[in-house]
Structure formats: structure tokens, C-alpha cells
Amino acid sequence: MSRVGKMLVAVPQGVDVSINEDLISVKGSLGTLLRPAHRLVKVQNEAGKLSFTPLDESAEANAMSGTMRALVANMVNGVSKGFQKKLSLVGVGYRAQAQGQKLNLQIGFSHPVVKEMPEGIKVECPTQTEILIKGADRQVVGQLAAEVRAFRPPEPYKGKGIRYSDEKVAIKETKKK
């Protein structure tokens, strides 16, 4: 059995987990998340702790018990604390502005780039060169951060572009005569 799958997931106060045959629902202060339950994994809620057991001894069932445990742990963490990604804009004239559910970027193109945020995701710009993407669903927050970064990834010679705040960009040396 997967070592990750053997660990129990503690459900904190204020988080409600309901398990049907094919759907796991996690409700908390930051929203509700749904995930289909895998057919090879049995999920049980025992006194505020979730356990994940494979239904047979196949390698797929063992692997999926660990995967389901990690995904549900992220759901529980997301609806109680939430997830966030911080992006930095590096470059002359590069600016970001949050307008409700839209992110307006001026990143060196002839036109502003506008990114619409889905429901359940909050975007903030503490300064003109910082973007904070917050939400309960870890996968959606990470995917949106990657999509925003893809508009202008950091280039290797000067480091200009959009990067994660903790990302280190390796700067190349220019060609010498």
C-alpha cells in the first residue's frame, strides 16, 4: 500500500466532508470543492479523520489511494486556509492592475492583456509589479498563475518578464566578439 495513502487526513473544525459512492464534497469557510471518488479506493470518515484504502492489491489501486489522499488533503486545506501564488513583473513599463474579476497587464505589447478570473478565484495587485492569485482550489490557482506567467515568461538575458516571486532566473552571458 502507498505510504502516502496510509496517512490519515485530519478534518479541522468548521470543515464538513461528505462522501457518496462516486463523489467527495468538502465544505468550509472559503467555499465548497467536489471531486469524483476513484473506483479502486474506499474513503471513510472516522471521527474527524479520513482514511483511504485500496479495494484490491493491484498497483493501480495502491497508487490511486495515495493520489486520492493527497487530492482530498489539498481540498481540506483549501477550504479552510486557501492557497495563493505570488507573481512579480520585472521590466521597464510592466504593470498589473486588478479590476474586479479581471487582471489587466501591460507587459510590452502594443495592447493591454486582459485575463478573466474564474469564479472562486480572487486576484489582487498590492503594487503595480506584484500579482496575488488566491483561491480554495490548489489546481486552479496554480494553473492560472502558470497561464499569467506564460504571457511573458522571464527571458534569459535580462530577466524581464513575469515570474513566480520565489523563482530564480538564470541570467545568461551575452555573446562576446
Swiss-Prot record:
Cystine crosslinks: none
GO terms (BP aspect): cytoplasmic translation
Membrane-traversing stretches: none
GO molecular function per UniProt: rRNA binding; structural constituent of ribosome
Pfam families: Ribosomal_L6
Any one GO CC term of the record: cytosolic large ribosomal subunit
PROSITE patterns assigned to the protein according to its UniProt record, in alphabetical order: RIBOSOMAL_L6_1 (PS00525)
Sorted UniProt keywords: Ribonucleoprotein, Ribosomal protein, RNA-binding, rRNA-binding
Domain of life: Bacteria
InterPro entries per the UniProt record, alphabetical: Ribosomal_uL6-like, Ribosomal_uL6-like_a/b-dom_sf, Ribosomal_uL6_a/b-dom, Ribosomal_uL6_bac-type, Ribosomal_uL6_CS
Subunit structure: Part of the 50S ribosomal subunit.
Function: This protein binds to the 23S rRNA, and is important in its secondary structure. It is located near the subunit interface in the base of the L7/L12 stalk, and near the tRNA binding site of the peptidyltransferase center.
Record-stated family: Belongs to the universal ribosomal protein uL6 family.
Protein name per the record: Large ribosomal subunit protein uL6
Taxonomic source organism: Leptothrix cholodnii (strain ATCC 51168 / LMG 8142 / SP-6)
High-level lineage: Bacteria, Pseudomonadati, Pseudomonadota, Betaproteobacteria, Burkholderiales
